[in-house]
């Protein structure tokens, strides 16, 4: 199985995240599948623990690849809040973060929760970079 020895990228504000992603895109180009995404939904209520992240509620940032894979996808929720391109209506912040983080519990931060603070950078804020091959 997949055993990454790294942690998710964290401590980035929205503008720093976008600058990094633009640099990566200019270095590697884009693919024909650039618009694809994982649309699998899941909840944190599975009593077997199969859909719970190891990091959620652990109070520490956990290395990637240590969760139980669901649909062969690792670390799709929890650990760090992830920046999205979704707008957060009724606020001054143009972008939303979602997914919960390591400092909260399952009941506090389910996968669908969104919040905002696009000018902030905390160790619990991060992003996911996907490379299509």
Where are the regions a protein language model picked out?
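Active-site-proximal beta-strands of protease catalytic cores
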Residues: 77-86
């Amino acid at each position: 199985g997949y055993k990454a020895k790294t942690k998710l990228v964290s401590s980035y504000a929205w503008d720093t995240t976008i600058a990094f992603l633009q640099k990566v895109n200019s270095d590697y180009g884009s693919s024909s599948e650039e618009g694809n995404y994982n649309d699998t939904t899941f909840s944190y209520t599975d009593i077997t623990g199969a859909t719970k992240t190891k990091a959620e509620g652990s109070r520490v940032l956990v290395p990637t690849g240590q969760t139980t894979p669901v649909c062969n996808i690792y670390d799709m929720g929890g650990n760090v809040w992830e920046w999205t391109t979704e707008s957060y209506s009724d606020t001054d912040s143009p972008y939303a973060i979602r997914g919960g983080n390591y400092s909260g519990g399952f009941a506090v931060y389910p996968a669908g929760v969104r919040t905002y603070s696009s000018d902030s950078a905390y160790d619990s804020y991060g992003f996911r970079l996907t490379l299509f091959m």
